[in-house]
């Protein structure tokens, strides 16, 4: 932004970094593409080639959704400003209601995961290890996961895209809030799994039980429809989400 300002002045122009300088005209914002990876370069938001990798994929997707649900106000505060409040909600900007868009594929996978029984979903074999009862997750195509431009926090194939930050801000605040929320949620996930293991559950069964509970609890934050619609504002209020600008 500093470079843009200097260069524009050099050519007798000015850069408008205001989120909504003109009423009725599209405003400006920033999209933060966010993912997580291991020290070996493995993207934790990419489905793997086997069922074990897919369980890892589901684990990190579900915990991210859970973090957005539990710390919704923190994420909203990280992008809040008077000028951004004028931008959010119309003309290609995401709404002020923070929700997650997953797309049909991932939503169906999570619904199936939630509704399956432990016995149906997990088989533990001494030689082969963990098996998931549902088939291998198909290759995720950008076209199938990135259609909803009205979502402020959308899954886009191998990452999440946080679309709410304004054009004049440093994205560090939004990323700090998101990283902190997900990190804290992963710590809680570990505690919940270990608590079930202490009761005698195997690690695989404990992970599955915790994920099922998280999927059910965080459902109010999931929305794949039109974020601009009045129906969504009413539905979001019923779900207990923050609907204020």
Which residue ranges define each predicted feature?
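An acidic- and aromatic-residue-enriched active-site/binding cleft used to recognize and process polar
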Residues: 13, 18-24, 30-31, 37-41, ...
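Acidic/histidine-rich catalytic neighborhood
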Residues: 28-59, 63, 96-100
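Acidic, glycine-enriched catalytic cores built around paired aspartates
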Residues: 7, 21-22, 51, 56, ...
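Active-site acidic/histidine clusters and adjacent loop/turn architecture
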Residues: 1
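Secondary-structure boundary elements
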Residues: 5-14
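Structured core elements
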Residues: 14-16, 26, 33-35, 44, ...
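Aromatic/hydrophobic pocket-lining residues that form π-stacking "cages" and hydrophobic walls in ligand
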Residues: 4, 64
């Amino acid at each position: 932004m500093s470079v843009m300002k200097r260069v524009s002045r050099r050519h007798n122009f000015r850069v408008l970094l205001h989120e909504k300088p003109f009423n009725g005209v599209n405003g400006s914002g920033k999209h933060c593409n966010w993912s997580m990876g291991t020290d070996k370069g493995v993207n934790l938001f990419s489905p793997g080639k086997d069922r074990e990798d897919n369980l890892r994929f589901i684990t990190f997707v579900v915990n991210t959704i859970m973090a957005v649900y539990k710390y919704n106000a923190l994420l909203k505060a990280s992008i809040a400003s008077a000028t951004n409040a004028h931008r959010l909600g119309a003309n290609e900007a995401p709404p002020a209601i923070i929700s997650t868009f997953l797309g049909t594929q991932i939503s169906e996978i999570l619904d199936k995961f939630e509704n399956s029984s432990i016995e149906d979903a997990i088989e533990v074999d001494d030689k082969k290890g963990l098996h998931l009862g549902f088939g291998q997750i198909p290759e995720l195509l950008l076209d199938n996961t990135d259609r909803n431009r009205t979502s402020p926090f959308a899954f886009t194939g191998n990452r999440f895209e946080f679309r709410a930050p304004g054009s004049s801000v440093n994205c560090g605040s939004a990323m700090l809030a998101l990283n902190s929320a997900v990190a804290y949620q992963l710590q809680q996930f570990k505690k919940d799994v270990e608590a079930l293991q202490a009761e005698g559950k195997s690690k695989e069964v404990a992970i599955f039980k915790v994920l099922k509970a998280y999927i059910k609890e965080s459902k109010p934050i999931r929305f794949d429809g039109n974020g601009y619609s009045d129906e969504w504002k009413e539905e979001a209020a019923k779900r207990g989400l923050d609907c204020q600008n």
